[in-house]
């Protein structure tokens, strides 16, 4: 368990439930335009997970990027959303979204997302390659005082 996550916030239990719920879908296949539960695209997966806890996010990663409050990379917490450019839309246009599940003492993190090639998987960040080059920013959707 991350001590960092619980310090100064009441939402630790909610975040843990969110992470546990998301992890139940590891291995679920990717399908463009799908919002679960048998297949997901990236924004469909994030929307599905958050909706289960009463947070209604818009359907696309590019519109989800305009929700919540901006978070600096060094301040990432479990439950935060990370946004990346897509394959074909240029480096500044959001085309992919993931949710932070763990933050390590060195500032690296692990996120869960629906990958086009692997379905729902965990991914370390920074990865020294694909996701590091495409990272755009992060947002916090869940308020510090949100309860489970």
Residue ranges of model-derived segments:
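Soluble non-cytosolic domains of exported or imported proteins
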Residues: 9-16, 36-41, 70, 129
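Glycine-rich phosphate-binding loop
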Residues: 81
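Aromatic- and glycine-rich peptidoglycan recognition patches
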Residues: 94-148
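Intrinsically disordered, low-complexity
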Residues: 1-28, 108, 141-148
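Catalytic cysteine-centered active-site loop
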Residues: 24, 28-78, 89
């Amino acid at each position: 368990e991350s001590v960092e996550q619980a310090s100064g916030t009441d939402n630790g239990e909610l975040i843990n439930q969110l992470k546990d719920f998301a992890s139940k879908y590891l291995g679920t296949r990717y399908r463009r335009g799908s919002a679960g539960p048998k297949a997901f695209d990236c924004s469909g997966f994030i929307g599905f997970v958050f909706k289960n806890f009463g947070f209604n996010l818009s359907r696309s990663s590019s519109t989800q990027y305009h929700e919540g409050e901006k978070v600096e990379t060094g301040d990432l917490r479990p439950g935060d959303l990370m946004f990346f450019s897509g394959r074909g839309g240029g480096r500044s246009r959001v085309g992919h979204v993931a949710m932070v599940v763990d933050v390590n003492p060195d500032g690296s993190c692990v996120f869960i997302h629906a990958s086009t090639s692997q379905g729902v998987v965990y991914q370390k960040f920074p990865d020294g390659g694909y996701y590091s080059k495409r990272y755009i920013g992060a947002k916090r959707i869940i308020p510090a005082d949100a309860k489970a």
